[in-house]
Each structure stands twice: as structure tokens, then as C-alpha cells.
Design a protein with these regions (language model features):
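Short, well-structured hydrophobic secondary-structure segments
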Residues: 31-73
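Intrinsic, low-complexity N-terminal interaction/targeting segments
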Residues: 31-38, 88-109
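Glycine-centered tight beta-turn/hairpin loop motif at sheet-sheet or coil-to-beta transitions
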Residues: 14, 45-49, 87, 111-113
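Short amphipathic beta-strand/extended segments with alternating polar/hydrophobic composition
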Residues: 18-22, 49-57, 105, 114-122
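DNA polymerase processivity clamps
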Residues: 73-97
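Mixed-charge, glycine-accented linear interaction segment located at domain edges/termini
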Residues: 107-136
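Beta-strand elements of well-folded, non-transmembrane domains
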Residues: 43-47, 58, 98, 107-111, ...
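N-terminal intrinsically disordered, cationic/polar leader segments
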Residues: 5, 12-22, 29
């Protein structure tokens, strides 16, 4: 399963973070009946652009959805989305304090020749958009 549509999670005119659909042939296949979602995350600014694919399944999926819901509801908290595989060490980490959001991440594997690290500030709307799109 993947997200329904490509969507912009955040765009302040300088930086843009998007959630992307993943073609069926590139989605991770897990055990029938167990929660599993595969999606892409892309980041771009005036000079760089990068993307990576993440798969959340089983208790990793349930835990991250609970962490996102808690952070969004309280406007405080943090969570880290990462792929649980040996093929990448990409991640996106979100820390919210009183509705102000700090986002940092790495798209692509640090051990490959191409990866992109980024960091920017946003607000709680990014977390709400993310939660809405990955919850099924």
C-alpha cells in the first residue's frame, strides 16, 4: 500500500517537503493482514533536490502513527521515520515545541555516493498533513 496522491507537506517558497506515491512494483510486500505502507519523501530547495523511499510495517507502523498523533494533538513531542532495512540509513526527524516544528533528515544512504541532508523550520500543519496521508 502507498499514499493515495503525491502531496506537498510543506512549501515556504524556499524549501519544499513532499510525500510521494510509490509504484506497485516498488512497494514492499509484507504479510497479508499486517499494516504496511510504502511512500516516498522528497525535499528540495533552490540548490538541491533528493528523495528516498520508506516502508513502515507491523508494530513500526502502529508506533509511528501513535507518536505522530500524540505530537500533533499536544503540539509537543518528536518522532523519527526511518526505513527498517539494511539498504538505507535515510530518515526524517520531526521535533515540535509549542507548535513550532524543527525538521531534519537524510534522503538516500550515507554510504552511497548520493545522499541529501536537510534541516528547516515549519509549523504543526506539516504534521497534520503527514498524519492524514499515512493513516489508513
Amino acid at each position: 500500500m502507498t499514499v493515495k496522491n503525491d502531496i506537498v507537506l510543506w512549501d515556504n517558497g524556499r524549501e519544499k517537503l513532499c510525500l510521494l506515491t510509490v509504484p506497485n512494483e516498488h512497494q514492499y510486500k509484507y504479510i497479508e493482514g499486517i499494516s504496511c505502507i510504502t511512500f516516498g519523501i522528497s525535499y528540495e530547495n533552490m540548490n538541491f533536490k533528493g528523495c528516498d523511499t520508506f516502508t513502515l510495517f507491523d508494530h513500526f507502523y502502529s508506533n509511528i502513527v501513535n507518536e505522530i498523533e500524540s505530537t500533533y494533538t499536544s503540539l509537543n513531542g518528536s518522532f523519527r521515520i526511518y526505513d527498517v532495512g539494511a539498504d538505507t540509513d535515510g530518515y526524517i526527524e520531526l521535533v515540535m515545541t509549542n507548535g513550532k516544528l524543527s525538521v531534519k533528515g537524510q534522503l538516500g544512504a550515507s554510504f552511497s555516493s548520493h545522499s541529501l541532508m536537510f534541516e528547516f523550520e515549519a509549523d504543526q500543519t506539516l504534521v497534520g498533513n503527514l498524519l492524514q496521508e499515512i493513516t489508513f
